[in-house]
UniProtKB/Swiss-Prot annotation:
It comes from Pasteurella multocida (strain Pm70). It is found in: Cytoplasm. GO terms for cellular component: cytosol. Keywords: Cytoplasm, Gluconeogenesis, Glycolysis, Isomerase. GO terms for biological process: gluconeogenesis; glucose 6-phosphate metabolic process; glycolytic process. Catalyzes the reversible isomerization of glucose-6-phosphate to fructose-6-phosphate. Belongs to the GPI family. This is Glucose-6-phosphate isomerase. The active site is at E355, H387, K515. Gene3D superfamilies: 1.10.1390.10, Glucose-6-phosphate isomerase like protein, domain 1 (3.40.50.10490). Its EC number is 5.3.1.9.
Length: 549
């Protein structure tokens, strides 16, 4: 990939000039100028996903300049480099090939001259066989009973993705009960173990190195809990499987290495749900639905790689996001799914985006001081969020672009619940875009029989300025296929922005310093001695903890 500071490009300079005139134009004025703006500013994927970006403060000129910026930042070359197995993760000297995990076309993908697809397919076949044995009841626990509960022990990408997807696809769930343990806080594993039976529980230990502190601490606690009942250590093999590459450590734990499912260093943690890390997903919904999830992502991969930039959904979303943060001054983006099953979707992409693009050093090793990189990502399902934080989105002093996501068809057609949900989905983006003027507020009061003298003091508080940018993503129905496509769409959006921010999106050195310091502090907590080796604040906190424990 070429290392290009975006602010040095002609397109960036043109965008700065364009913004000076465009910033005075409101979204409402844009709709007045372009009567069928929806048609020109929306894109469809597979006739199952509609992305409407018309309620953004962009024009055809804006989009043209943003596309020129993508061209000057050599985006198409970067896309080809990623898909072809080039080692674009330079700081770790790794390829970035989560797309190969869902390569349903099975076309060769080379890393260091070797096609990775035979190994990918072998692990998928192994996962399929394992899922069949567990789901069918053929796999027995140490007392001869079938498995009823699966506990996935992992953290970060080994937890967030599988948990998000299993929740999103609960309508496809089989009889197995899925549980997820991530936090090293003993409460998490303790509360989970209260819900399961050692005779019928299967633990999946998800750690590439089998050394991750949080995961292995929880895994050993689960093992101790299991052996308190099972007694015989040979029984561990019937109740534990590993998602790892460290066969020696896996065997030492007591897991049969035949039940170790590997993945590769070209799979980043936050992009790993497509790999063996997704075994919990496959166990929850069945392997055929897991394959449909992969297929949806693969179709989005093909769209991203082949669609012209004008029709390219992930690229368009990325460019508009860059415009909102770097020219309109937004610092956050909210992801607001109007689907309760998607209640972990925003949290998943909080990691996906912020761990990928939360960088202040560019690919040249230079400090970035004249443009913004990754935004803060957050969100909650609608309509809950409307009664929590939408107030600030509508009337606060901070610009918060939002992605609204909703399915046209619900899995639970209870009375008129879905119509009420979707009426809010449609209403919110309309309200955010167009607001309510002082004159409209006054007219409402007059219609209600109030005189303007009576209400003049309250009128300003009921005015909505509007002009708040949103994307509306309407999905025909949340299925394994469409969910796979949605996830891949956001993954590629993140990638595009990383390319254009001139940063490395696939490392995460920011998580290391805290871990190093925690490893230094841990032995200091083993006794009651007063600590003086840190700054006064850290010393004071540690010493107070020692007094209170």
């Amino acid at each position: 990939m070429k290392n290009i500071n975006p602010t040095t490009t002609n397109a960036w300079k043109a965008l700065q000039q364009h913004h000076k005139t465009q910033s005075a134009v409101t979204i409402q004025q844009l709709f007045a100028q372009e009567k069928d703006r929806f048609t020109d500013y929306s894109l469809s994927f597979n006739n199952e996903v509609l992305v409407d970006f018309s309620k953004n403060n962009v024009t055809k000129e804006t989009l043209g300049l943003l596309r020129q910026l993508a061209q000057e930042c050599a985006l198409s070359e970067a896309v080809d480099a990623m898909f072809s197995g080039a080692k674009i993760n330079k700081t770790e000297d790794r390829a970035v090939l989560h797309t190969a995990l869902r390569n349903r076309s099975n076309s060769p993908v080379l890393v260091d001259g070797k096609d990775v697809m035979p190994e990918v397919n072998a692990v998928l076949a192994k996962m399929k066989d394992f899922c069949h044995r567990v789901i069918s009841g053929e796999w027995k626990g140490y007392t001869g009973k079938a498995i009823t509960d699966v506990v996935n022990i992992g953290i970060g990408g080994s937890d967030l993705g599988p948990y998000m997807v299993t929740e999103a696809l609960r309508p496809y769930k089989n009889h197995l009960n899925l549980h997820f343990v991530s936090n090293v806080d003993g409460t998490h594993i303790a509360e989970t173990l209260k819900k399961v039976n050692p005779e019928t529980t299967l633990f999946l230990v998800a750690s590439k190195t089998f050394t991750t502190q949080e995961t292995m601490t929880n895994a050993h606690s689960a093992r101790n809990w299991f052996l308190a009942t099972a007694k015989d250590e040979s029984h561990v093999a019937k109740h534990f499987a590993a998602l790892s590459t460290n066969s020696k450590a896996v065997a030492e734990f007591g897991i049969d290495t035949n039940n170790m499912f590997e993945f590769w260093d070209w799979v980043g943690g936050r992009y790993s749900l497509w790999s063996a890390i997704g075994l919990s997903i496959a166990l929850s919904i069945g392997f055929e639905h897991f394959e449909a999830l992969l297929a949806g992502a693969h179709e989005m991969d093909k769209h991203f790689r082949t669609a012209p930039i004008e029709q390219n959904i992930p690229t368009t979303l990325a460019l508009i996001g860059l415009w909102n943060t770097n020219f309109l001054g937004a610092q956050t983006e909210a992801i607001l799914p109007y689907d309760q099953y998607l209640h972990r979707f925003a949290a998943y992409f909080q990691q996906g985006n912020m761990e990928s693009n939360g960088k202040y050093v560019d690919r040249n090793g230079e400090v970035i001081d004249n443009y913004q990189t990754g935004p803060i990502i957050w969100g909650e399902p609608g309509t809950n969020g409307q009664h929590a934080f939408y107030q600030l989105i509508h009337q606060g002093t901070t610009l918060i672009p939002c992605d609204f996501i909703a399915p046209a068809q619900t899995h639970n057609p209870l009375a008129d619940h879905h119509e009420k949900l979707l009426s809010n989905f449609f209403a919110q983006t309309e309200a955010l875009a167009f607001g309510k003027t002082k004159e409209e507020v006054e007219a409402e009061f007059v219609k209600a029989g109030k005189s303007l003298d009576e209400v003049k003091e309250v009128v300003p508080f009921k005015v909505f300025t509007g002009n708040k940018p949103t994307n509306s993503i309407l999905v025909q129905k949340i299925t394994p296929f469409t969910l796979g496509a949605l996830i891949a769409m956001y993954e590629h959006k993140i990638f595009v922005q990383g390319v254009m921010f001139n940063i490395y999106s696939f490392d995460q050195w920011g998580v290391e310093l805290g871990k190093q310091l925690a490893n230094r502090i841990l032995p200091e907590l083993a006794n009651r001695e007063t600590i003086t080796t840190h700054d006064s604040s850290t010393n004071g906190l540690i010493n107070q903890y020692k007094q209170w424990r």
